[in-house]
């Protein structure tokens, strides 16, 4: 059987660089190497692109994926053809955060006309920007917690007014978030104005735009969505924490998080969550995959928190585990995502690019 040529891209110029490497390690070890000829491209923290061809062995440590000493090549050379001498059947970007899941690299793949896994330019960008995402959810009628947003330049000029707005509109605790970052990087839970000021200072180190959200005493529920024009959603799972706040450290380092799949919820609540996840997928015109995150209160009030256009595939990750619960194994999920990428690219070829 002739193998298909796949290129996995990971790393990236982002605060989520190490998360991307963890994800790449998991996917490389799970992908069907009898079906796929796999090359990898590592993007350093400085933005250099380095390639390694024909990965066949198990990746036992993330250290093996830091290709710092590899030859830096032009991007067009890296993606022109695989190490087998044939064009790539699909590129699989496993990049998290800015320059990876925000539409930028997706735009590159579009210009190069390369099939790629995951969301397109618009859906990736709108899912990355928490303010734009919330505005799209609002337009779709999806329930959300109160929030405000502002720019670094606005805060520097109107700090007093913005702090007053937060205190007038929201109740503590609140969560301060960089608008364009994931994996809980730069996020703070603030219980008073002093902590709020520190949280704002911390978040502005990562982005020029912040979102401050009302906190709520609720369970954190997640639903995985898979597909293109006709997506499917899993039964919900729950993030069960041994910590007060599900931050970067608890997500990826401490292991103080357990996943309960499926979540212990009434069936009607589970069905509502599945339907809302599909609505969120459509609201941001997604394709391939999305993880939709929700809050569910004790009286079963549901609020959508966000969608993640490139959810992680690490050992702690909810997305692949939700699909395993639906009967789709990890290797089968990877294969399905590649097939969806090819399907979307084939559909794009139906478009006309000149007027007769």
From Swiss-Prot:
Its cofactor is Mg(2+); Mn(2+). PROSITE patterns: ATP_GRASP, DALA_DALA_LIGASE_1, DALA_DALA_LIGASE_2. One of its GO terms (cellular component) is cytosol. It is an enzyme of class 6 (ligase). It comes from the Bacteria. Residues 134-339 form the ATP-grasp domain. ATP binds at residues 167-222. It is found in: Cytoplasm. Keywords: ATP-binding, Cell shape, Cell wall biogenesis/degradation, Cytoplasm, Ligase, Magnesium, Manganese, Metal-binding, Nucleotide-binding, Peptidoglycan synthesis. Mg(2+) 1 binds at residues 293, 306. Its EC number is 6.3.2.4. Mg(2+) 2 binds at residues 306, 308. Belongs to the D-alanine--D-alanine ligase family. This is D-alanine--D-alanine ligase. It comes from Staphylococcus aureus (strain COL). The gene is ddl.
């Amino acid at each position: 059987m002739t193998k298909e040529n796949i290129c996995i891209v990971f790393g990236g110029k982002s605060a989520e660089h190490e998360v991307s490497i963890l994800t790449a390690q998991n996917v490389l070890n799970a992908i069907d190497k009898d079906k796929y000829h796999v090359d990898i491209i590592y993007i350093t923290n400085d933005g250099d692109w380095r390639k390694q061809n024909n990965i066949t062995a198990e990746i036992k440590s993330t250290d093996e994926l830091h290709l710092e000493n590899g030859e830096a090549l032009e991007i067009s050379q890296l993606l022109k053809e695989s190490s087998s001498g044939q064009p790539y059947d699909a590129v699989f970007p496993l990049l998290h955060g800015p320059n990876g899941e925000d539409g930028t690299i997706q735009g590159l793949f579009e210009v190069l006309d390369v099939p790629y896994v995951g969301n397109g330019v618009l859906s990736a960008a709108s899912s990355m920007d928490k303010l734009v995402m919330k505005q799209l959810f609002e337009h779709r009628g999806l329930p959300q917690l109160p929030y405000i947003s502002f720019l670094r330049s606005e805060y520097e000029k109107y700090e007093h007014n913005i702090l007053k707005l937060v205190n007038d509109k929201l109740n503590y605790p609140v969560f301060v978030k960089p608008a364009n970052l994931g994996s809980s990087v730069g996020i703070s839970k603030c219980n008073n104005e002093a902590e709020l000021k520190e949280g704002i200072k911390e978040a502005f180190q990562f982005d020029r735009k912040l979102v401050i959200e009302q906190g709520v005493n609720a369970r954190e529920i997640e639903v995985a969505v898979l597909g293109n024009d006709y997506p499917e959603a899993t039964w919900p799972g729950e993030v069960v924490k041994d910590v007060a706040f599900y931050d970067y450290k608890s997500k990826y380092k401490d292991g103080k998080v357990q996943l309960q799949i499926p979540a212990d919820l009434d069936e009607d609540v589970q069905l509502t969550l599945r339907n809302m996840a599909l609505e969120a997928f459509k609201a941001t015109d997604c394709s391939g995959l999305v993880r939709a995150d929700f809050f569910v209160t004790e009286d079963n009030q549901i609020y959508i928190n966000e969608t993640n256009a490139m959810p992680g595939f690490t050992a702690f990750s909810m997305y692949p585990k939700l699909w395993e619960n639906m009967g789709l194994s990890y290797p089968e999920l990877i294969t399905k995502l590649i097939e969806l990428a090819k399907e979307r690219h084939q559909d794009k070829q139906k478009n006309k690019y000149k007027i007769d």
